[in-house]
Amino acid sequence: MEDHKLSLYDNIAKVNAVDPELYERYPVKRGLRNSDGSGVIAGVTNISNVHGYLMNEGDKVPDEGKLTFRGYSIYDLVGGDATKRRGFEEIVYLLLMGELPTSSQLDALVEALDAQRNLPDGFTASKIMSTPSHNIMNLLQRSVLMLYADDPKAEERSFEHEISTAISLISRLPRIMVLAHYAKRAAFYNESMIMHRFIPGQSTSETILSMLRPNREFTPEEARMLDIMMSLHAEHGGGNNSTFTCRVLSSADTDPYAAYAAAIGSLKGSKHGGANHKVLAMQKEIKENVKNWEDEDEVASYIAKIVNKQAYDHTGLIYGMGHAVYTLSDPRAVICKDFATRLAKGTEFEAELNLLKLIERLSPEVILQEKGTKKDMCANVDMYSGFVYSMMGIPQDMITPLFACSRMAGWAAHRFEELVSGKRIIRPAYKTGVKAREYKPIEER
């Protein structure tokens, strides 16, 4: 029996290998990408735009990155105001409603979020504490599906219900995330289970920090930094994997809980939202192996080892550098680095931040030197986001879940747009590479 099992495992790679030549023959847009790396146009959206290059007579020309939500620049939306408390909520309103809120409209949204923050009776005990998960993303995904059972109108497709469901999940996911973290620590690491009640009137970022920290204390600067991070991650176009996943399921006319749970599953992937863990692990290795973080030659030497597949995970990739769209700059990384610089100045984190800036500056030079090719690459938001979260004492296993809590607003906006304007189920085609075969009875095989 064991030999039979092994033969099944051995055949998996062989049976599922598609001849690479077939991708060229048909031709296939692998990963829904064109040959120049740009995405295949699969739809039109009024929600956001991600700009990273220009096209000149068919050639990609690098350009400074731009990110707009409903036509507004992310630089203007986030701004430089260090005292702003509800930037994320303002962006949530903009994404869902299409316009920037007035003061009274923003207050109404905040009240709606507060009203939905509590979980259904018994949910925490039966759905979180009694069934903890080693991975918070899995528990988030499971919880979204379980909230379906507590919604008597779960299959209703009215706009009122869609908006109500979206606001409910935007409000509840942060609470589920923090509870899932403590349930995990209690179940698998024998730590105390901490459950703070939320404080009405707090912003989303304040609520997260207040529920996460045992003493509930945080500074206005920390709350503002988390607010900025959530704003930067709230939306990033319709073509990213999790948002497209949400649109695909929405085009099939499934319920909102199923669509959002699928998006969370996509975001968990190491090639999407989970990529930040690779960045943090690589940065940790560099910090441990480079003695003088200010020595450019020593830092460049270790980056060269990574590029030449002699260090870290031996893939030759410098995680945190490069992006599918952005070429000269990622506006999210620019903003993140700017606010991180302010927060780290004069603290024990300043030297580490300077090292990250050095990695960002040296990486293109090292690649050119080692590979002989000049790449238009910039730091992406993951280069600095993990560092920012570490400054705030946010555990690493909460980074991708925080991403999900932030992106929930973007997923909802795209689901709304798909329901109104999509009209057709998303159904691309697949060519077959298998020729017709003659069926033989089992005794003749």
Identify the role of each PLM range.
Residues 1-445:
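Non-transmembrane, aqueous-exposed alpha-helical and coiled segments at domain scale
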